[in-house]
Amino acid sequence: MDRAVLLLSVLSLGVSSQPITEGQRLFSIAVERVHNLHLLAQRLFTEFESSLQTEEQRQLNKIFLQDFCNSDYIISPIDKHETQRSSVLKLLSISYRLIESWEFPSRSLSVGPAARNQISPKLSELKTGILLLIGANQDGAEMFPDSSTLQLAPYGNYYQSLGADESLRRTYELLACFKKDMHKVETYLTVAKCRLSPEANCTL
């Protein structure tokens, strides 16, 4: 029995002492950062929604379900099965575009200055990290083989002065889309990171 316990201890030590590659380290950092951004987006949306009247929530949710997020123009997997079939480079490239699409609109989010000041640097850091991962996984492939010159239109008219109702709708749309996109990026980066572990089950 003692011998078996000793053998298991040695095997466990061997597994835990496996070196972590630079790619795994970068992926871990990127996943943690987008997870924090996703949590922040969820909190901001929940706080804004709780400040609305019940009828306002219902109407805005109804309008949002009929609308599109600006980032919907970025071609991405339509479901979890397509996500799992996508290459690591494709998932990274889509994630990069999604993060990039929020660099300017995030400055107009109707949230407190403390939260808004957190978002821009977090997006910038995550974008830099994803770019490093793309470079490490490119292997001679073109970074954005599909529509590399894609230009996204601004989010609604957030740069213009709006009436109270339109301003409310704009804020709801921006926060809901921000939450949706951070969830997408977290999913894509988590699946891409999982691919580094051949024995891992990457089922969503």
From Swiss-Prot:
Disulfide bonds: 69-177, 194-202
One of the protein's GO biological processes: animal organ development
Binding residue positions for Zn(2+): 35, 186
Subcellular location: Secreted
InterPro entries according to UniProt: 4_helix_cytokine-like_core, Somatotropin, Somatotropin/Prolactin, Somatotropin_CS
Modified residues (Pyrrolidone carboxylic acid): 18
Signal sequence coordinates: 1-17
Keywords: Disulfide bond, Hormone, Metal-binding, Pyrrolidone carboxylic acid, Secreted, Signal, Zinc
Main location: secreted
GO molecular function annotation: growth hormone activity; growth hormone receptor binding; metal ion binding
GO cellular component, one term: extracellular space
Family (UniProt): Belongs to the somatotropin/prolactin family.
Cited function: Growth hormone plays an important role in growth control and is involved in the regulation of several anabolic processes. Implicated as an osmoregulatory substance important for seawater adaptation.
UniProt name for this protein: Somatotropin
Originating organism: Morone saxatilis (Striped bass)
